[in-house]
Amino acid sequence: MSAAKAAVHQPWPGLIEAYRDRLPIGDDWTTVTLLEGGTPLIHAKRISELTGCTVHLKVEGLNPTGSFKDRGMTVAVTESLARGQQAVLCASTGNTSASAAAYAARAGITCAVLIPQGKIAMGKLAQAVMHGAKIIQVDGNFDDCLELARKLTADFPTIALVNSVNPYRIEGQKTAAFEIVDALGTAPDVHALPVGNAGNITAYWKGYSEYHRDGVSDRLPRMLGTQAAGAAPLVTGAPVKDPETIATAIRIGSPASWNSAVEAQQQSDGRFLAATDEEILAAYHLVARTEGVFVEPASAASIAGLLKSVEDGWVKRGSTVVCTVTGNGLKDPDTALKGMPQVTPVPVDPSAVVAELGLS
């Protein structure tokens, strides 16, 4: 009789249990989790060859609801439940609503979502609807929605605001930096990521800084935050009244985490830059076709920023770079299908298929 085979690896417990000693979680709190975190860090071979750097992709679209938001939401909803709050509320361009709705459903509490009129990808809205969220469309943009959410939760303290202004969101999201250092053995030279409401760059810098402070990592990365050119307040230094970009997840004109994002950029000797929609879409197609990673357009801003920064010399060849790709491409299928070539039927004949493929 053959010996029993050992498990290939231990099951991932979710990020709260994995990093409990580094999170502000009470011992008696009931954890609200969908086993988020533990996402892969994939070596991007062809983008590495293109840039002359060693590039890794932190693929956050493989979190339970398809985006990095789940990292913060597990901690924020766990804390809200511990405080006995009756509902959670968020303003959202899409991913936050999907995540908040899922974790509220898991916790057995109400979720309400304020969305800007006509400014949300349908895949994300479908998730929130399926998880039972109460969807409220606001005649305004994301910034208007967030201001309304702030006022509402201030007036009704039984409702928790779970946007990234909630510090527990930042605590959960910082764990992605822990995972990167755990995988690489130290921090990368450069960490590139998209910037919208700016909570994520704040969280990554917090995570890297804590690991460095405690001697887990012997260095800190330079933070490279890329905004869409039509929604680039951190680049221009002024709020954008009517932000516009195909990258809906970062279509934000006045980031809630503005000050902490600037601190992360300055303390890390990093930079903010703007990428046009054309540059973002080029990176979106590049990562899908050369690395097999399908991301939503906003996610590709990190790669667009890297390409621009290699071109202008800010990122030196030979650097180790991590690009966070924040959301799954299935969040926004409409963008992927735009410009799709006309499909013409072929006969039920192997030679016809071979000819269509251009093979011999």
From Swiss-Prot:
Keywords: Amino-acid biosynthesis, Isopeptide bond, Lyase, Pyridoxal phosphate, Threonine biosynthesis, Ubl conjugation
Binding site residues for pyridoxal 5'-phosphate: 95, 196-200, 326
Cofactor(s) listed: pyridoxal 5'-phosphate
Position(s), cross-link Isoglutamyl lysine isopeptide (Lys-Gln) (interchain with Q-Cter in protein Pup): 151
Keyword Amino-acid biosynthesis annotated: yes
Protein function: Catalyzes the gamma-elimination of phosphate from L-phosphohomoserine and the beta-addition of water to produce L-threonine.
Protein name: Threonine synthase
Species this protein is from: Mycolicibacterium smegmatis (strain ATCC 700084 / mc(2)155) (Mycobacterium smegmatis)
